[in-house]
């Protein structure tokens, strides 16, 4: 059974999100991507200090199959400007059968 996952990737800007998204689609590691901007990320920086930093980023949401995860993760890390990019996969527990069929066809 094919398991769909949604992969969230924070990018430095829209150009980076578009570049990574296009590569993922061309390599058949993503059937579809969505790009949302701006998203505001908040975190402690430098790490383990008490200064809260807020930055605008671009969110790349990737629709793919769980079987593509390792290749996708490697490709994103190679093409991302961050030392530690956010690459988080969430399983889609309920997906319409037609959409899952389309997604699977696009990725095989």
Q: Which residues make up each language-model segment?
A:
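Positively charged, small/polar-rich N-terminal and surface patches that mediate targeting and assembly
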Residues: 1-108
